[in-house]
Amino acid sequence: LSRYGMNSKDSIAQLSVMYIVERIIDGSRLGLSNRLMIDAFEPGNVLVEFKTGREEDFHKIALAGYALALESETNVPTDYGVLIYIRLNSEPYPKLNVRPILIDEELRRDFIDLRDQAMAIVLNEKDPGIAYKCHPQCPYKDYCIG
């Protein structure tokens, strides 16, 4: 089973379900956590991520990172993803915006470039400075700005 990228009982159990929710993948081959969690995984190697905040470009890049990690684990191409934005307004039902994403070579390179920049900051112990614009929900906002 290990030759198919199934390195745990959880991986084997998850393959028995057609629509997999919260699939754990090993990102350590890419220098990431060994317990990455994608929100959902559909047959045909389609990654699905649910978001409740506003749409951001980095969401697509993160999806490419998940695809690379999954590919390194399974040796099966993962070229498609879906970002589903959930809006909870005053309306009686949530509004869903579904964004299909082609995970192409450019998006993969964008992820690798960002990963390499982050690793260089950590390895060189270089202070990246204060961001030009902070995300309103950043957990480090008080620490950086003071």
Predicted features and spans:
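Acidic-basic catalytic patches of nuclease active cores, encompassing PD-(D/E)XK
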Residues: 1-24
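Solvent-exposed, charged interface segments at domain starts and junctions
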Residues: 1-4, 60-63, 133-136
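A generic structural signal for short, non-catalytic loop/turn and secondary-structure boundary residues
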Residues: 14, 76, 131-133
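A generic, residue-level signal for flexible/boundary positions that often mark functional hotspots
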Residues: 19, 95-97, 138
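Nucleic-acid nuclease catalytic cores
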Residues: 26-123, 142
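Cysteine-cluster motifs in flexible loop/terminal segments that predominantly coordinate metals
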Residues: 120-146
